């Protein structure tokens, strides 16, 4: 009887460990996917220019800039229209600049890739126009 109980408990423990590991692996894969659509690389080394264009793009999209730190490379803003907070970080990587946007509505992260695609499309257009001295 005791042997049967020990075998059952052992099997349950092994099953619980396997489930936990699977959840951890799925969570890491999900994080990588999220990071992928939240991040874009731009072929420039001018961090200040990119940050200025991010501020302009966020304002064009209805965000009020709450904080911008050029030394650290972060910009935060809030949209009263749709109650959304967005923080964008900028960091150099080789001969390019990596930009990562993170948006949330209340306490819930925005996970729709299209929202980030819209932001990066507007930012790309702004950088293009600035580079070609249209603005």
Spell out what each predicted region is.
Residues 1-4:
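Positively charged n-region of N-terminal signal peptides that target proteins for export
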Residues 7:
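Phosphate/nucleotide-binding beta-alpha loop and adjacent structural elements of enzyme active sites
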Residues 13-16:
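C-terminal motif of bacterial Sec signal peptides marking the signal peptidase cleavage site
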Residues 18-135:
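Ser/Thr-rich, low-complexity intrinsically disordered terminal regions
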């Amino acid at each position: 009887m005791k042997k049967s109980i020990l075998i059952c408990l052992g099997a349950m423990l092994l099953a619980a460990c396997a489930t936990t590991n699977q959840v951890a692996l799925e969570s890491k894969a999900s994080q990588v996917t999220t990071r992928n659509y939240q991040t874009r690389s731009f072929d420039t080394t001018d961090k200040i220019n990119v940050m200025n264009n991010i501020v302009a793009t966020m304002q064009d999209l209805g965000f009020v800039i709450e904080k911008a730190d050029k030394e650290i490379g972060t910009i935060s803003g809030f949209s009263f229209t749709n109650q959304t907070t967005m923080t964008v970080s900028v960091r150099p990587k080789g001969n390019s600049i990596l930009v990562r946007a993170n948006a949330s509505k209340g306490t819930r992260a925005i996970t729709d890739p299209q929202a980030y695609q819209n932001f990066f499309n507007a930012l790309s257009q702004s950088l293009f126009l600035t580079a070609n001295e249209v603005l």
